[in-house]
Amino acid sequence: MESTITIENVVASTRLAEDFDLEKMMESGLEGAEYNKVKFPGLVYRINNPKAAFLIFTSGKVVCTGSKSIGNAHAAIINLANTLKSICCEKIDLEPDVRVQNIVASADLKTNLNLNTIAIAFGLENVEYEPEVFPGLIYRVEAPKVVVLVFSSGKLVITGGKCPEDCEEGLRIVKTEFDNLGLLY
C-alpha cells in the first residue's frame, strides 16, 4: 500500500525592501492588485505564472502562498521582485532570502478508516477527534512537527512541514502506526 504526498500549497516569506509605499504601488499600475488598508494592512497581488498570491506589507515583507512547490514559490517571489523593480520600487532585493513557513500536502491511504477505533487505539496523547465539531481526526506528530488530518475515506492532509521531506516523514509515521495497530486493511 504505497502512498505518496501531493503538495497542495507552499507558504513562503521574505523581505524585498526596507519598506513599501503601498499607495504608490497601487498608483503605479500593479495590475489586479487589491489594497484597502481599512480592511487589511497589506496589498494583495496574484500572478498566474507560476501561480501564486502575495501579501505585500509596508514593512517590505512579502508572504507568498498558493504555489505547488518550493521552487515555484521562489520563482514567484523573484518574478514579483522584478515586477516591482520595473514599475515602482528601485531598492528591491532581487536575491532575497526566501523562507518556507508551511507546506500543506495531501495523501490517500486508499482504504476506509474507522476514526473511532483510531482515536481509542492512540489515546489522548497526540490525537483529537470530535466528529460533532470536525469530521477528521487530528494527529500531531512530534518529529517532524507536523499535523495530519485523517479522514474516514483514508484521505490525509499533512500540514506544518518546512520541506516536502517533513510531510513524507509525517505520512510514513502515521502509516507505520496504523499498520502496527492493524488498522490498514
Swiss-Prot record:
GO process annotations (BP): DNA-templated transcription initiation
GO molecular function: DNA binding; DNA-binding transcription factor activity
Superkingdom, natural source: Archaea
Pfam family, one: TBP
Keyword terms: DNA-binding, Repeat, Transcription, Transcription regulation
Function: General factor that plays a role in the activation of archaeal genes transcribed by RNA polymerase. Binds specifically to the TATA box promoter element which lies close to the position of transcription initiation.
Name listed for the protein in its UniProt record: TATA-box-binding protein 3
Gene name of the record: tbp3
